[in-house]
Amino acid sequence: MSVVFESARPIADGVHWLGGCLSAFGHGEEVHYHVNAYLVIGRRRTALIDTGDPAHRDLVLAQLDEALAGRALDYLVPTHPEIPHAGNLPALLERYPDALVVGETRDYHLHFPEHAHRLRPRAAGESIDLGGRELVLLPAHIRDLENTTWAWDSGAGVLFVSDGFSFIHDVPGPDDEDEPVHRPGQCRLLSGEMPEPPSVAQAAYGTGRALYWTRFVDVSEAFGAIERVLDAHPTTLIGPAHGNVIDDVDGMLRTSLAAHRAVYAGGGLGQ
């Protein structure tokens, strides 16, 4: 797969969308899928949510240099220990020797024993003070690993949801791929900037493959919890790890719930 290079995109005051797209060929055409990371800049501290894919290591480092504009990176907040979410931790910790890994870090000492002294466990409900804004750690109500964490930025009202709220556009994924995909030219677009809003079928296609457990679980209770999260944490944007940043929060919530229900009913698997 080739890497599609894109510059970091500011999506809100103090929030930058980093990472890149991987490309593959499926069903006779090129398709891309996002592997996202997000930088939140406060008055005193900065935090990076997820690390991007190791294939994007040099890109993420360059994007950080640009977005930080000479400031240090203080906190790394991987949402869970999978390669697209934590794979660049060694490179980032080397580049930023004073940065700390903060969040649900219960098994990171096993993956990165040489960096165990830089782990700072924080539980859901705790906050990271960045100066003028806080990054609030939250339970992940849609997840593929038990120790997944979501986060909410109080400064701009951005909810970072890891593998939640992923969706595809226009085309099914590359053969044997599980990631939400889109066509070239649609990288780094907000969901509202896409030619068409995501459909239930597009959301269901990615959901049923990337989160296999959704085929067997009625998520109505989880979405009730998500609505309570949104009530308590006013949200203007949702930043998934895979897929476009969502600027129609209410619409995507309805679409995603319908997609999960379709997968559970066996009607959203693209088969």
Residue ranges and their predicted role:
Residues 6-64, 149-153, 157-161:
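Conserved beta-strand hairpin/beta-sheet module of binuclear metal-dependent hydrolase folds
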Residues 10, 96-148, 217, 221-224:
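Metallo-beta-lactamase
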Residues 49-51, 73-81, 100-105, 159-163, ...:
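Active-site neighborhood of phospho(di)ester-bond hydrolases with catalytic His/Asp-centered motifs
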Residues 43-46, 69-74, 234-235:
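Short, surface-exposed connector motifs at secondary-structure boundaries
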Residues 33-35, 61-69, 210-221:
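Helix-coil boundary/capping segments in enzymes
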